[in-house]
C-alpha cells in the first residue's frame, strides 16, 4: 500500500494495517518536512513491522537530527530516492533554495543508515547543457539513477527549446533525439522571459548559477 502524506490527509483516516503492511511509499511535497512521515514510521515500529519496505522520495534539502536518522535506521528494507538535477551551482539553481553542501552532508548521513540510495534526475532545456558532468558525478558516487524528461511546462521541454539552444547542443550525444527542428520551438525571447520571471520570483540571477545559459540569453 502506498501512503502519500499530504497536509489535507488526516492520518487517522488512512486505511493502513501497520502490523501487516508490506510496502509504504512516502512521496512529495517533501516527506522529511512533513511530521506525518515520522508518525507513520513510529506506528510501524510500535507494531514490530520494521521489515516493511519503506521508499522515500526526497529533495535532500533537509538535515535530519540524529533521532530521526535512528528511527529510519530501524527499517531493514529502506530506499531513499533523492531528486538531483545537476551538481554544484546547477543543482542549487534547479532545486532552489536547496544548497549543494547540505545535500552532500545529507547523502552521507543516508548512506550510514541504508545501502539502498538512488537518484531521480529530471532533464530540462536548462540542465541538458550540464548532462555529462551530472551523470559523471552520479557514476563517481556509485549511486544508481533514473532520468525523466520534462514535457511540462512546455518552455522547459527538450522538444520545444529554442532553435538557438538546439544548435549549441550538436556535440551533446544524449540530446540528439531532441535536436531536430520541428517548428514547435519557442522563441529565445519567450524563453528568456520565462527564466527572468522565475528568477525575479526567487530573487536570484541565472548568471550566478548557469553562466553558459546566461551568456546565450544576453
Language model features by range: what are they?
Residues 1-9, 18-35, 47-65, 73-104, ...:
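Core AdoMet radical
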Residues 6, 10-12, 30, 42, ...:
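Glutamate identity and glutamate-enriched acidic tracts
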Residues 10-13, 67, 90, 187-190, ...:
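Exposed alpha-helical structural elements
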Residues 12-14, 40-47, 70-71, 106-113, ...:
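A generic secondary-structure signal
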Residues 38-42, 65-72, 130-132:
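Distinct, well-ordered alpha-helical segments
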Residues 55, 76-81, 100-217:
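Conserved C-terminal portion of the radical SAM core fold
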Amino acid at each position: 500500500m502506498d501512503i502519500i502524506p499530504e497536509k489535507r490527509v488526516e492520518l487517522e483516516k488512512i486505511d493502513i494495517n501497520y502490523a501487516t503492511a508490506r510496502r509504504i511509499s512516502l512521496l512529495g511535497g517533501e516527506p522529511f518536512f512533513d511530521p506525518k512521515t515520522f508518525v507513520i514510521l513510529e506506528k510501524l515500529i510500535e507494531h514490530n513491522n520494521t521489515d516493511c519496505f519503506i521508499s522515500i522520495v526526497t529533495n535532500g534539502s533537509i538535515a535530519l537530527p540524529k533521532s530521526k536518522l535512528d528511527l529510519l535506521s530501524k527499517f531493514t528494507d529502506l530506499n531513499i530516492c533523492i531528486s538531483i538535477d545537476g551538481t554544484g551551482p546547477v543543482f542549487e539553481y534547479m532545486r532552489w533554495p536547496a544548497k549543494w553542501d547540505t545535500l552532500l552532508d545529507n547523502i552521507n548521513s543516508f548512506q550510514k543508515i541504508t545501502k539502498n540510495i538512488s537518484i531521480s534526475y529530471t532533464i530540462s532545456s536548462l540542465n541538458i547543457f550540464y548532462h555529462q558532468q551530472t551523470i559523471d558525478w552520479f557514476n563517481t558516487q556509485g549511486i544508481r539513477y533514473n532520468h525523466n524528461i520534462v514535457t511540462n511546462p512546455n518552455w522547459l521541454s527538450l522538444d520545444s527549446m529554442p532553435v538557438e539552444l538546439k544548435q549549441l547542443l550538436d556535440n551533446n550525444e544524449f540530446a540528439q533525439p531532441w535536436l531536430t527542428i520541428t517548428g514547435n520551438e519557442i522563441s529565445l525571447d519567450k524563453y528568456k522571459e520565462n527564466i527572468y520571471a522565475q528568477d525575479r520570483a526567487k530573487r536570484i540571477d541565472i548568471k550566478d548559477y548557469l553562466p553558459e545559459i546566461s551568456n546565450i540569453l544576453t
